[in-house]
């Protein structure tokens, strides 16, 4: 107080005021404080003080040639006095105004390309539709979401290499562009940005937005794809939500959505094959999504979904350490347990072998439409706090938690036998048996569970067995909360192992995922999914199987032809004929197969009876295990278009139609490809032309090894002999000529000699 009085006293004297306002500051410490370092100590003051001066800006001298000395109002735009300490000119803020109005206009052609993500966002918002605002409690849960629509899925390192290559191509530093996407993007961007005048740093920032997925952990109630997240601040508050339909889609959301659909289809299909893991890998490697290889997408895309994670595990990639049960993602937040096998009796006195988890554990459960916190001990649910969008979602969460708890009253609530099977007709494991049972009907489970009186806790309410809310009573241990449970934020990935049946385990042997956890939801993919694997032919129905099978034979005709004559059994066992079997009526499959195999054997035995069209047409029928019978068929039935259709053994039919003139095969009216050789022109065509330079020595001679296809002949050395398979399924012995002179006459003699060798 004394000090303040003293200061007031001093300030009342005019001399004090004069000293403080007029004298220069010459205390070294003060000068040091305001002048050391590059950092401005009082930016706003500095700005105000600078702008109060007449010429606060400095610029390169050449600006004086581009800006007049005075503007239209006669105000001076730049000073003739040089800036102290540099050879730059001092410029008035008015010069900036003049430049903005009258300065040169640069080309704007690159702006939409560089600021692509912004231009696209404006378009989406322009075409988006905002609906009504609803006031209601928002159950938001924090989820990891993509906040950057329209990006490619490169890793930070990959993107950095692309950016350096595009923006600073001459900088030193090793950059290795390896992935397909890196190379495509680099080429595209280099072309787009020729003669671009925008600052390289800005270009680099904008490219980063385009190439890398940026995620944040945000509270969301509703759509989580990036086109919804970009308007999160407009669509949901604490107590309101605004309906919104985006005005456009972005590729990254489409990739995520299509990847999930492809992965689900592949896991479902692999689960029913003889070797699920091998099949799954084969399908992942041969599938493309929107023109990009699925395996490349899996390596880069962080989407966490059960089927996607199974595919990643199969490829040896790390996945999240949380596990899945009943469509919920469980993450243990505390406690620990040990597994012990125990036999329990259901209410129907059926014995189940359960892997019981002994110990106290706490979990968060996060599903699509409900979330929960679960505390459990050995075979006992202690507490379940659940929140969901609607009654149905809450029921789903409660059922999953009750089954997961392994409580005795849950096992005893089973009525009837448990015999659920998976797609491959194998019995499900006991936990999934119980889950399926109560997912069908949970009435008995809820009634048997027991109820208890509850305390009044803010934000929580009880729930009765018939799913009505109550403030007095609740099912034992179960409460419904207004607040959602956040998704587990840790993005840590762990090394996992996968067994032949696609069960994914962590390093401690806990099962994290299995095909039973893959959702059965069907959806329509946004991007084209191309499954090249024959295992996926049936996904589009019987017609697709039929067409794909015949297309495959035609595409591989050269090798098929050799196998047909040399090693038919191997050919019949090819997996490409597997899907076709489902089209042939079960009762007669074996007879058809026996009939066709006998027919083929006759063709092999009787020279000159080889008939390409017939072999192609009947080959798929020979793949089933044959039954020996005397039956002859003039037509074979296949089940397509909802009924049996007939393929004629000799001649064309609506199913299989070969046009000799155009050499085109149509299956069910759809083009199935062109045969590269004509089955009915004898041997004079392709063979005699290709056999120029070879001498035909006579019939096949086994000492010279298996028959080669015509394409393989080019590998022979001069004078070398080999057996070769010619168009009619006949094998002849040839020798490559030692001289080239007589090549012209070869084609005539070839034709004669082939006839002689055969006959």
Swiss-Prot record:
What does the UniProt function comment say about this protein? Answer: Plays an essential role in transcription initiation and cap-stealing mechanism, in which cellular capped pre-mRNAs are used to generate primers for viral transcription. Recognizes and binds the 7-methylguanosine-containing cap of the target pre-RNA which is subsequently cleaved after 10-13 nucleotides by the viral protein PA. Plays a role in the initiation of the viral genome replication and modulates the activity of the ribonucleoprotein (RNP) complex.
According to UniProt, the name of this protein is Polymerase basic protein 2
- At which positions is motif Nuclear localization signal? 736-739
Principal subcellular localisation of the protein: virion
Report any one BP term from Gene Ontology. Answer: symbiont-mediated suppression of host gene expression
Pfam families xref list:
Flu_PB2_1st (PF20947), Flu_PB2_2nd (PF20948), Flu_PB2_3rd (PF20949), Flu_PB2_4th (PF20950), Flu_PB2_5th (PF00604), Flu_PB2_6th (PF20951), Flu_PB2_7th (PF20952)
Subunit record text: Influenza RNA polymerase is composed of three subunits: PB1, PB2 and PA. Interacts (via N-terminus) with PB1 (via C-terminus). Interacts with nucleoprotein NP (via N-terminus). Interacts (via N-terminus) with host MAVS (via N-terminus); this interaction inhibits host innate immune response.
* Gene name as annotated: PB2
- Please, which domain of life does this record's source organism belong to? Viruses
Q: Per the record, where is site Mammalian adaptation?
A: 627
Q: Which compartment or compartments is the protein found in? A: Virion; Host nucleus; Host mitochondrion
Q: Does the keyword Repeat apply?
A: no
Family, per entry? Belongs to the influenza viruses PB2 family.
The entry's cellular-component GO terms read: host cell mitochondrion; host cell nucleus; virion component
Q: Which UniProt keywords apply?
A: Cap snatching, Eukaryotic host gene expression shutoff by virus, Eukaryotic host transcription shutoff by virus, Host gene expression shutoff by virus, Host mitochondrion, Host nucleus, Host-virus interaction, Inhibition of host innate immune response by virus, Inhibition of host MAVS by virus, Inhibition of host RLR pathway by virus, Inhibition of host RNA polymerase II by virus, mRNA capping, mRNA processing, Viral immunoevasion, Viral transcription, Virion
Keyword Cytoplasm: yes or no? Answer: no
Name one molecular function that GO assigns to this entry. RNA binding
Q: Which InterPro entries match?
A: Flu_PB2_2nd, Flu_PB2_6th, Flu_PB2_C, Flu_PB2_CAP-bd, Flu_PB2_middle, Flu_PB2_N, INV_PB2, PB2_helical
